[in-house]
């Protein structure tokens, strides 16, 4: 388990079990779920790939070279992990492709398979991703009984909707750099770095808000001044501590939200504000970066409920299957089940 995540509270207490995740790429399978169908015609070639041990940007750049286009002419709905087997779509602005033999691309890149091709009238964008389905295999698991007991709780209550360790970079470097940028008022034209550091800053503060609620025993219990979200992420103006709202939260019809910090005033009041404002105040450098880039405040649910969650056990091996909506992290589910033993990897 990444040390950076040990900063945040566990909903069910720190796990006693240990295990290995991603011992092989085949132990972490991700399949992308888009929110719409392609038209079958248009200037954009849509390519469904299965990649093993490769990251999305590398494959996209290699595919752009093969097609004879610039990197900016290729796009995707979501970035996928390198240490996994992942299926996803790429789009290439390529009005004509009859001259290309795509088998040659697969031969040159044995870690990539082309599964399907079609066409569409516009390119893929990050907001196009509806979610992902996962199959995760944890190996060398100890204390399997405790893991299974936790899984039963997860199925009912869910897990904290934390941003995962990958959001914060290797050893939390994105947060460290975000603080430096805020402190030194760094200005740059590198939009990629700016995006990484802003995301890390807001995610770090958000995670701390959830962690504080767990510590004080208010993870799934609304308090005065809370902002609730419906199933379409729209804010709900009701008496949030009423029995009706509490029952809707238990049924998953409403969810408690926490702040993705911005340069405008927090909308929470009373006790809910006391969970949020101190976390913003504790990170003046991160807030300087957020305000300096005129980020607007947003809300995000504090609960994550994996859909279609089921599992199987074979000896000391646990197989998990579930689906998540876009923007959620599979690793925060595993985090509530076991302490991850780091797997040594070699890099080409």
Swiss-Prot record:
CDD domains: PseudoU_synth_EcTruD. Pfam families: TruD (PF01142). InterPro entries: PsdUridine_synth_cat_dom_sf (IPR020103), PsdUridine_synth_TruD (IPR001656), PsdUridine_synth_TruD_CS (IPR020119), PsdUridine_synth_TruD_insert (IPR011760), TruD_catalytic (IPR042214), TruD_insert_sf (IPR043165), TruD_pseudoU_synthase (IPR050170). One of its GO terms (molecular function) is tRNA pseudouridine(13) synthase activity. The keyword Isomerase applies. GO terms for cellular component: cytosol. Keywords: Isomerase, tRNA processing. The active site is at residue 81. Residues 158-304 form the TRUD domain. The keyword Isomerase applies. It is an enzyme of class 5 (isomerase). Responsible for synthesis of pseudouridine from uracil-13 in transfer RNAs. NCBIfam families: PRK00984.1-4, tRNA_TruD_broad. Belongs to the pseudouridine synthase TruD family. HAMAP family: TruD. This is tRNA pseudouridine synthase D. The lineage of its organism: Bacteria, Pseudomonadati, Pseudomonadota, Gammaproteobacteria, Vibrionales. The gene is truD.
């Amino acid at each position: 388990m990444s040390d950076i995540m040990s900063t945040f509270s566990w909903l069910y207490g720190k796990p006693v079990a240990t295990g290995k995740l991603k011992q092989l790429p085949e132990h972490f399978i991700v399949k992308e779920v888009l929110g719409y169908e392609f038209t079958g015609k248009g200037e954009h070639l849509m390519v469904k790939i299965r990649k093993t041990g490769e990251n999305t940007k590398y494959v996209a750049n290699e595919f752009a070279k093969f097609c004879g286009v610039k990197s900016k002419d290729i796009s995707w709905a979501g970035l996928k992990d390198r240490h996994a087997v992942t299926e996803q779509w790429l789009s290439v602005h390529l009005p004509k492709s009859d001259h290309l033999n795509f088998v040659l691309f697969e031969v040159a890149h044995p870690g990539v398979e082309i599964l399907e091709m079609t066409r569409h009238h516009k390119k893929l964008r990050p907001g196009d991703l509806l979610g992902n389905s996962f199959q995760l295999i944890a190996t060398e698991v100890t204390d399997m009984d405790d893991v299974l007991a936790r899984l039963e709780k997860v199925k009912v209550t869910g897990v904290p909707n934390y941003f995962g360790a990958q959001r914060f970079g290797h050893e939390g470097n994105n947060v460290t750099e975000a603080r430096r940028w805020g402190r030194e008022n760094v200005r740059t034209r590198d939009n990629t770095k700016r995006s990484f550091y802003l995301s890390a800053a807001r995610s770090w503060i958000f995670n701390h808000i959830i962690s504080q609620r767990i510590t004080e025993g208010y993870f799934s219990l609304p308090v005065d001044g809370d902002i609730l979200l419906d199933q379409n992420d729209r804010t709900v103006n009701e008496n949030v501590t009423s029995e009706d709202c509490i029952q809707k939260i238990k049924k998953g019809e409403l969810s408690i939200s926490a702040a993705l910090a911005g340069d405008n005033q927090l909308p929470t009041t009373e006790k809910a504000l006391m969970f949020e404002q101190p976390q913003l105040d504790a990170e003046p450098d991160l807030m300087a970066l957020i305000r300096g880039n005129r980020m607007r405040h947003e809300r995000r649910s504090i609960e994550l409920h994996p859909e279609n969650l089921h599992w199987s056990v074979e000896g000391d091996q646990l197989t998990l299957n579930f689906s998540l909506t876009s923007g959620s992290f599979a690793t925060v589910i595993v985090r509530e089940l076991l302490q991850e033993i780091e797997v040594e990897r070699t890099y080409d």
